[in-house]
Amino acid sequence: LNKNGSNILDLKSPLIEKAIFKSCSIKKKVVEADEKEMGMRKILNFGHTFAHAYEATLGYSKKLNHGEAVLLGLKTAAKFSLLNKILNIKEFKLIENHLDELNLPRDINKFFSIKNEKKILSFMKKDKKNNTKKINLVLLKKISFPIYKLQFNEKKIHLFLKKELNK
């Protein structure tokens, strides 16, 4: 992606087909290895807890489609990984630069303000992946190495969102 990211975005490029095929192949392997989503398959949820909360907060409006919400969720989860010392700054910058290249909405402050923080957090708490009073998140140790058995208390996410939405 770092080498061919901008070329992949050109929908006429033969690289788009290769990128889609590779993505689908990876997803297929993960799903086949964990059909019931009891372990490794959870890595496919990276960014989605934030993304689904963003969509729900906006009432599933046309302001933000699912793909755009996932992009924002990926960026938010990467930032949360960085701030919790799980992901290093070099890896975070690679992710951030790649997502910024996509020329899609990538700043949560264009959609949300500090007034939305409680609502976003409320939807995160209702996420189907949670099985305790804590919020389950898939975060990144490094690119291609997600960690899926992480639980965070509401306060930690509240403080993070408050900081991110106050820019």
Model-derived regions, located:
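Carboxylate- and glycine-rich phosphate/diphosphate-binding segment that chelates Mg2+/Mn2+
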Residues: 1-44
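Flexible, glycine/charged-enriched surface loops at secondary-structure junctions
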Residues: 15, 35-43, 64-67, 87-92, ...
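Short glycine/serine- and small hydrophobic-enriched flexible loop segments
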Residues: 56, 75-83
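Catalytic Zn2+-binding segment of zinc metalloproteases
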Residues: 53-62
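Small-residue-rich helix-loop
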Residues: 67-76
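Alpha-helical transmembrane segments of multipass membrane proteins
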Residues: 26-30, 53, 80
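Active-site His/Glu-centered metal-binding helix of metallohydrolases
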Residues: 46, 50-54
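C-terminal charged capping/lid subdomain of soluble metabolic enzymes
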Residues: 86-167
